[in-house]
Amino acid sequence: MTDENYPEHHLDYRPPLSAIDLGKVVYNGTYAEIYNYARDEYMRSIGYPYSKFLNEDKKNFAVIEMNVKFRKPLHYDEETVIVSKVEKIGTKSIVFDQKIYKENMQVLCNEAKFVMVCIGLSFKSEKIPEVLKNAFKNGPVK
């Protein structure tokens, strides 16, 4: 895997009512969905939407490891920012580092690390396309 300094992606996010549990905070199981949404937006921002990866490249990223740390609760409609960053890209795998902040990026609420493997239609690991690796290196399309 290569360690490089990949650009961060920032996404403004307000938890919807559907994400809230009986304790009036974001349900713990929902964080995986929130982070998945942020990764989709990250890929869209670099000019390589996940839909292209799925439909044209016929590839997918399968989560093989997920580590989540819960620090502060998130509430319905609260203004937050999700920061997503590629930590490492290998031949067939990628590591995403993601964090959720509130109060103008002053309070870290949640952080997660996802290790994902590129797979094809046969569900066997495949190489990550070089064009996608380069898109992550180059960052958001202006």
Task: Enumerate the predicted regions with their spans.
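HotDog/MaoC-like acyl-thioester-processing domains
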Residues: 2-3, 11, 70, 74-76, ...
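Residue-level signal for pocket-adjacent positions within structured domains
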Residues: 15-17, 48, 56, 123
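Residues that recognize and position ribonucleotide moieties
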Residues: 24-25, 61, 107, 126
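Residue-level recognition of specific faces of alpha-helices
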Residues: 33-34, 62, 115
